[in-house]
Structures are given as C-alpha cells and as structure tokens.
Amino acid sequence: VRDAISNPISHEPLGKLVGPKATVTIAFDDASGSYFQTQRDDFRRVAIEVIVEELRQAGVELGNIRLLCAQGLHRKLSRTEMETFLGRKLVLQFGYNQLYCHDAEDPDQLVHLGYTRRGFDVEVNRAVLDSDQFIYLNTMWAPFNGGWKLTAVGLGTFRSIRHHHRPWPAAKGNSVDDPKNSSFKKLVWEQGEVIQKTLERKGRRVFTI
C-alpha cells in the first residue's frame, strides 16, 4: 500500500497532491466483494490506516478526512459490518460525522454532471467533486471491476446505474467479464469520461489504489 501511494502509475505521489488545508474523501468497496469476516485483518482497514497516516504526514487535518462506503444501490453497511471491515479503532476515530455510506436517494449527497455522448445520465456522490482530493480504495478483484466502474457505479444513483445494470448491455456485449468487448464496460467508461472532464476543469483527478 505504501508503495502504491508513493509510486502510483501515471500519477504524482499522494503526499504531493494534498496540503494542510485539503479536504479528502476515501471511498471504499462495500460488502459485495468480501462480506465475510476474515481470519486476517481486512484489507480495507490495513489500507485506510496507511492512507490516513500518509495524509496526516502531508499536513491534512484529521477533521478534513472522510471515509465513504461506495455501495451503489446495495444496502448500507451496519455498524457491526463497518467494524468488521475497518476495525473498531477507525470507526471510533472517525465517528458518524466522518464515516458514512453513500445514499443514492439523498439529493443533498448527489450531483448530476450531465450526459454521455449517447445520452446516458451521469450522477454521482458530490464528494467526488467537492473534495480537494478524492481517493478510491478498490478491494474487489474481478474482470468487470476497476476503473471508472468504481466511481460511476459505487457512488452512482438509479438514474445513472439503470443504463448498464439491465439485460441489454450484458446480452449485447458477450460478457461483463470481457473488458474489451463488454457493452457494460463501455457504458461505464462513457460515464467515467464525463466525471473525468468535470474533475479536470477543477484541476483534479481520482487517486485510485
């Protein structure tokens, strides 16, 4: 994790992207990828502790760091599940004001960014845009996962997710596990392009681990 933060691919090190007054959101995967209690420490806890340590060393105040569970349209995590994934220490350290689940039905959390070139909605949690640095911690290893799917789906809404979470993209694209030919993946990438252009206008990028 430390190596990924210090030597990211095609990106500046995390420590150079933030400063003392920066606001940071760390989004992480929900229970759909790893929902059972492991004998070893959950990677979410291990990684987030390292990320927070790096941010603090860069001068970011603890009160300016938010942890956001990106569960898309899945149910929200319970406190017990949060403690299983993140450990009681992190849960108590951040509390309910700084540790929360994405709410795809709360208009105050959401922002509509526009449409893709084919007219598909792009709507995500506003933390993606409002944070000085948005970080996504990906812990689900699957061919259909990764890239813009993390943000566009994990922090999306019904309005935007409905375009690719239905039979047509899966049937037309052979398999969602085939990134090159997957219609699902292409739709998500189109939405990601809108997110990226919006962030670029603010001089920002998503930092993915």
Task: Provide a role label for each language-model segment.
Residues 1-3:
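N-terminal amphipathic/basic leader segments beginning at the initiator methionine
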Residues 6, 31, 139-140:
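Residue-level marker of positions within ordered structural domains that often coincide
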Residues 6-18, 122-130:
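Short amphipathic alpha-helices and their capping/turn segments at secondary-structure boundaries
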Residues 11-75:
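N-terminal active-site beta-alpha-beta segment that forms phosphate/nucleotide-binding
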Residues 38-47, 81-86, 148-153:
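"Short basic amphipathic alpha-helical interaction patches in structured regions
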Residues 62-116:
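Acidic low-complexity segments
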Residues 92-209:
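Conserved, well-structured core segments that form the ligand-binding/active-site neighborhood
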